[in-house]
Amino acid sequence: MKLLYEGKAKRIYETQNPNEVICEFKDSLTAFNGEKADEESGKGALNCAITTLIFEALEKEGIPTHLIKQIDETKQLVKKVDIILIEVVVRNIVAGSLAKRLGLKEGTKLPFTIVEFYYKNDDLNDPLINDDHAMVLELVKTRKELDLLREYGLKVNKFLSEFFDKVGLTLVDFKIEFGRDENGNIILADEITPDSCRLWDKKTGKKLDKDLFRFNLGNIKEAYTEVLNRLKDVK
């Protein structure tokens, strides 16, 4: 397989179909824009399984994704997309950069869900942007597309909040990415995993996400395995 692209968490390979690629989840762990890095054996397989499970559930809810099927422990066959260079961050509870930026106390429940856009650019440390910035940077074609990203973000949040709640997890916040398929349709891409979500146990408040690695709070593999096992029980 010819390697087309390698990022911090995934490798993308070409297939015989020009509109499909293989996405391989790596065992690498990174935080603080790559300043902190490590490896955790089995982490790629866990994130691949979690993303497959969640994307299949989202498809049933009418939210289009790039997933075609999982083909082995760490690989998915997905639709080839042109990634939109906007990270859509959805927040239900104050945590992370929001607490730091606005001086709000971590753990505070927000009065309503906040949707933020970040410019996907490592050299600039993925800065927070507004709609005007997105248009000036030509990250989207129209403001209606920004509205669609926001709408999808809120739809994903509504579904995932209920999905995780069923297994005793609070969805604090998450990051998602989108791309354009061969027909120009905007669809959900990348992943939804404990790498890209903050998940807290409802009873204990225990973190079951990448903050464990960021701040040396516990074992990533144990936490991600627990998340996957809980999600398998969703009825």
UniProtKB/Swiss-Prot annotation:
HAMAP family, per the entry: SAICAR_synth
PANTHER family linked to this entry: MULTIFUNCTIONAL PROTEIN ADE2, SI:DKEY-6E2.2
Domain of life per record: Bacteria
SUPFAM superfamilies: SAICAR synthase-like
Keywords: ATP-binding, Ligase, Nucleotide-binding, Purine biosynthesis
Protein name per its UniProtKB record: Phosphoribosylaminoimidazole-succinocarboxamide synthase
Keyword ATP-binding among record annotations: yes
This enzyme's EC code(s): 6.3.2.6
Catalytic activity: 5-amino-1-(5-phospho-D-ribosyl)imidazole-4-carboxylate + L-aspartate + ATP = (2S)-2-[5-amino-1-(5-phospho-beta-D-ribosyl)imidazole-4-carboxamido]succinate + ADP + phosphate + 2 H(+)
Annotated NCBIfam families: purC
GO biological process, one term: cobalamin biosynthetic process
Source organism of the structure: Nautilia profundicola (strain ATCC BAA-1463 / DSM 18972 / AmH)
Name of the coding gene: purC
Name of a matching Pfam family: SAICAR_synt
GO MF assignments: ATP binding; phosphoribosylaminoimidazolesuccinocarboxamide synthase activity
Protein family per UniProt: Belongs to the SAICAR synthetase family.
Pathway annotation from the record: Purine metabolism; IMP biosynthesis via de novo pathway; 5-amino-1-(5-phospho-D-ribosyl)imidazole-4-carboxamide from 5-amino-1-(5-phospho-D-ribosyl)imidazole-4-carboxylate: step 1/2
